[in-house]
Amino acid sequence: MKLAILGAGCYRTHAASGITNFSRACEVAEMVGKPEIAMTHSTITMGAELKELAGVDEVVVADPVFDNQFTVIDDFAYEDVIEAHKEDPEKIMPQIREKVNEVAKELPKPPEGAIHFTHPEDLGFEITTDDREAVADADFIMTWFPKGDMQPGIIDKFIDDIKPGAIVTHACTIPTTKFYKIFEEKHGDLVTKPETLNVTSYHPGAVPEMKGQVYIAEGYASEEAINTLFELGQKARGNAYRLPAELLGPVCDMCSALTAITYAGILSYRDSVTQVLGAPAGFAQMMAKESLEQITALMEKVGIDKMEEHLDPGALLGTADSMNFGASADILPTVFEILEKRKK
């Protein structure tokens, strides 16, 4: 199998967050006995996993930065990073972040510059600056593109070089629905004829070097392609999840924090209403829908930054407390504390 990686990534944004580390990369490095994997990041980590753990025999990385300032920081011994991560990553991560931030001050941003700690060629990857060369005959095309409206222009340059039946994935910078739309608008028959192009995601849900997980979007690829990618993801990333394409953003992007709170609330509310009160599931669903729709409508009407002006958080303290039983009691006490702090 040939894997084409379009976009090598840059560590500066990972360092800037102040919370990331190399836990997954170190784990893989130890598993396969290749210390140089320990400080890989972004697509390079995922490429190394696919090569070493899933048996992908050819990996090509394309990025214009290879003709510019692709910078490898070699101040840190891989073995030292691995040992630190066995105990507490923060024993070494502050020094790494400090060095990255220092280098980033003088180095241009991608595609003119990028910060890495391992060169892809040292992992047995081929490199190129030509996306067309990379995707030629590739079975799996993993994109790692910038945000915004730049993706259609990038895709337009190589779309005619993708072989029929190939799997093309995106990560965190675009929804699957919009990613598919680009291919549909550029080359409709490519995604609608029998030998279809399989558009999906290989979304890590976090920085790849930190967590071993991947989220695969269903709806725009064949079942066979999804199964193939799911099996690769399980072997390479350790944990793989399939989900409808429209749920990928809510589950994987920054709004996942809200999704987690909302979903836990729905499930707890449902169990309290149906199991303790004995209400029909349809009634519980009707009430849940009313809650979600009206709070969403309020946010859209007045703006997320002005919601408290129109609904005092304290208004819920004297009503929701009557539902503080069953599964809801696992959540509501903490919620009440938050509402109390925010009430007018």
From Swiss-Prot:
Pfam families: HMD, HMD_N
GO molecular function, one term: N5,N10-methenyltetrahydromethanopterin hydrogenase activity
Keyword field contains Protein transport: no
Listed pathway(s): One-carbon metabolism; methanogenesis from CO(2); 5,10-methylene-5,6,7,8-tetrahydromethanopterin from 5,10-methenyl-5,6,7,8-tetrahydromethanopterin (hydrogen route): step 1/1
Keywords associated with the record: Methanogenesis, One-carbon metabolism, Oxidoreductase
EC number: 1.12.98.2
Catalyzed reactions per annotation: 5,10-methenyl-5,6,7,8-tetrahydromethanopterin + H2 = 5,10-methylenetetrahydromethanopterin + H(+)
Gene3D superfamilies assigned to the protein according to its UniProt record, in alphabetical order: Hmd, C-terminal helical subdomain (1.20.120.1300), NAD(P)-binding Rossmann-like Domain (3.40.50.720)
Enzyme class: oxidoreductase
Family: Belongs to the HMD family.
Protein name (record): 5,10-methenyltetrahydromethanopterin hydrogenase
Organism: Methanothermobacter thermautotrophicus (strain ATCC 29096 / DSM 1053 / JCM 10044 / NBRC 100330 / Delta H)
